[in-house]
Amino acid sequence: MNKTNGKMNAIYMSDLAQAYFPKSTPRSASAQLHRWIKLNDELQRRLEELHYKPRQRALTPLQHGVIVECLGEPGE
């Protein structure tokens, strides 16, 4: 997670997607992460509760945390 002075900052969806799919192009990685979100009912529900929109470019710290909680840390 991006942290500055102990505070968590927003993270771009493309950066998170690249962390999960480092061998993919940014566009392909983003498409795959969106696919994973769409296929995971619990993750999709929890993100919707946090006002996530499918094509938003930046994630709030809470949205980012939910994705990592449901999918695991990138690289695991």
Name these PLM-found stretches.
Residues 7-24:
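Polyanion-binding surface elements
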Residues 15, 32, 63:
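Ca2+-coordinating acidic residues in Ca2+-binding motifs
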Residues 23-58:
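Major-groove DNA-recognition helix of helix-turn-helix-type DNA-binding domains
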Residues 1-7:
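Positively charged, polyanion-binding regions of nucleic-acid-associated proteins
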Residues 57-76:
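A short, Lys/Arg-enriched interface patch at domain edges and termini
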